[in-house]
Amino acid sequence: MSNNQSRYENRDKRRKANLVLNILIAIVSILIVVVAANLFINSPSSKDVSKDSETAQKQESPASGKTEKKSDEDIKDSKKDTSDSEKDSEKSSDSDSKKDDSSSKKDDSDSDSSSDSAGDGLKDAKVTEGGSSSDVEKTYENPDWKAVGTEQTGEHAATYDSSSQDWAEMLKAISYATGVSTDNMTVLWLGNNGSPQDAKGKILDKATGNKYQVTITWVDEKGWKPTKVEKLK
């Protein structure tokens, strides 16, 4: 009796254990199915993936377009800056060229003026060949020559001191008659011409090499006045 009861109990326990095990297996299987179903349902389809890819490309495309547009603008700005720089350089070069041309013309003008200076004072003078001596090539006389003015006052007497005011005014009269500036002349001789109010000087024009002998006379309160110029041989 006891053996039958013991076998019965063991069989019952095994049956219960199998039941529990089957239940657990069923639960696990259900969970697996549920999880698999969720994964399958939630996984993106190929169409969705394609749409997402297209959307991403569209979003990136404007950015790329903006980048390309910005790059083009940068290139245009760079070209504009380069063009402006070249224009400024050309303007500066043209300006420098004009300045150089102007300076060159001025130098040429000064040179021409220096070359022609000896003729300016003699332009309207009456010219005769020869003169008071054999070494005179031409004689110039002009009744329109004026006294050159003076800063001296009182009674006048010619002074042949190269540092005196009278000497400076005599050279001024010689320069006026010949057209040779005092800076461009070499005084070969300057002295009395027969009276305290008459003088004569010989000069060399540094620019042309011409020599002139000039006769001058004193006019009260008006200074020295040239009366005759002789070009020497």
Swiss-Prot record:
Which ranges does the record mark as transmembrane?
Answer: 21-41
InterPro entries per the UniProt record, alphabetical: DUF1510
Q: How does it sit in the membrane?
A: Single-pass membrane protein
Q: Pfam families from the entry?
A: DUF1510
Q: Does the keyword Membrane belong to this entry?
A: yes
Q: Where in the cell is it found?
A: Cell membrane
Q: Give Gene Ontology CC terms.
A: plasma membrane
Q: Which residues form a coiled coil?
A: none
Is Aminoacyl-tRNA synthetase there in the keyword field? no
Q: Which domain of life is it from?
A: Bacteria
- Under which name does UniProt file this protein? Uncharacterized membrane protein YrrS
Species per Swiss-Prot/TrEMBL record: Bacillus subtilis (strain 168)
Upper classification of the source organism reads: Bacteria, Bacillati, Bacillota, Bacilli, Bacillales
